[in-house]
């Protein structure tokens, strides 16, 4: 297995810690006035999603996780598994509900998602940054109702609920940022 020095740590690097794949969220190099320098690292375990803070002595090495990120198109769900297809090889991969997690509300058929594979098995599914979904339920916008401009909740075709401006009506297609679950704009 390949190893990486703490001097090469950066956000997004995937490591094996306690025999589990993890990704570095933040890395801070600390050189105290007295004593040895160290790295304070915030990591997320890819299997459980837990966020931890660890410290590594400067110059230590850590094993690089053997994980692959591949782009696949979402096909369908059969109730138990979510099926994805590679557009070049037409190979299909099934991910369980644990790998998809809360991102299930952003899965739209034929959208390209990023799957993280470890030992050939999907451990995480990342939807595209923006998806276009239809509003299936929201309160009607009343003319002149401008007090509290926070918007109103709207239920989308996948079941996700986001806050939208008052002028959005049922049946409109809107663009949503999947990272923050925020309304971006109307789709024309």
UniProtKB/Swiss-Prot annotation:
By its UniProt entry, which PROSITE patterns does this protein fall under? Answer: EFP
Report the record's Gene Ontology biological process terms: peptide biosynthetic process
**Which keywords, in A-to-Z order, does the entry hold?**
Cytoplasm, Elongation factor, Hydroxylation, Protein biosynthesis
UniProt-listed Pfam families: EFP, EFP_N, Elong-fact-P_C
Where does it live in the cell?
A: Cytoplasm
What this chain does, per the entry, is described as: Involved in peptide bond synthesis. Alleviates ribosome stalling that occurs when 3 or more consecutive Pro residues or the sequence PPG is present in a protein, possibly by augmenting the peptidyl transferase activity of the ribosome. Modification of Lys-34 is required for alleviation.
Q: What is this protein called?
A: Elongation factor P
| Species, as recorded | Vibrio vulnificus (strain YJ016)
Q: Which gene encodes it?
A: efp
């Amino acid at each position: 297995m390949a190893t990486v020095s703490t001097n090469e740590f950066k956000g997004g690097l995937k490591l094996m810690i306690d025999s589990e794949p993890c990704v570095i969220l933040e890395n801070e190099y600390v050189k105290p006035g007295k004593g040895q320098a160290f790295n304070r690292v915030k990591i997320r375990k890819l299997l459980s999603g837990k966020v931890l803070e660890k410290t590594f002595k400067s110059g230590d090495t850590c094993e690089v996780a053997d994980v692959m990120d591949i782009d696949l198109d979402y096909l369908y769900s059969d109730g138990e598994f979510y099926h994805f297809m590679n557009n070049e090889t037409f190979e299909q991969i099934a991910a369980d509900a644990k790998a998809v997690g809360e991102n299930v509300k952003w899965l739209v058929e034929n959208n390209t998602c990023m799957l993280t594979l470890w030992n050939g098995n999907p451990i995480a599914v990342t939807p595209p940054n923006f998806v276009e979904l239809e509003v299936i339920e929201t309160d009607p916008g009343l003319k002149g109702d401008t007090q509290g401009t926070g918007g109103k909740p709207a239920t989308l075709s996948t079941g996700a609920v986001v806050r939208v401006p008052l002028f959005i009506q049922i049946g409109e297609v809107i663009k949503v940022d999947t990272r923050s679950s925020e309304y971006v704009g109307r789709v024309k």
